[in-house]
Amino acid sequence: MALIVKKPKGTEDIVPSKVYKWHTVEKIVSEAAEIYGFKEIRVPTFEETGLFVRSVGETTDVVQKEMYSVSAAGDSKFTLRPEGTSGTMRAVLENGIMNEGLPQKVYYILSFFRHENTQKGRLREFHQFGCEMVGSESPRADAEVISLAKSVLD
């Protein structure tokens, strides 16, 4: 009997007949973000585990129960990204993007990974759009992000 390999529980295949829908959504989101002055950023699929422990919180369910982590040579430990803000902020700081002036506006459309109980609408690998406005404490910044979200949904 042949061994049948199936996709992991909580993941989905985006087959050729469905990819066009993804491209359409990604285009709408990207164009809206760029109209508002956001620039796309792409961060690694995995980061040092400590980044998420510090930013998300050591006692949160995400860190305690839901992260996919692996140990590497030495004392290194890496985690598949469970959310986007931590890696995005690390990249903004590490690459000196804030030195280009404030506020800095970045967006991402990425895959994320959490070991959760699967159910309709909740997968272990999921896709998310996010935007970060760095260096502005103004309520106008929040209003701008809300306006961006509304324009995507319209």
Please provide the spans of the model-predicted regions:
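TRNA-recognition modules of translation machinery and tRNA-sensing kinases, especially anticodon-binding
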Residues: 1-154
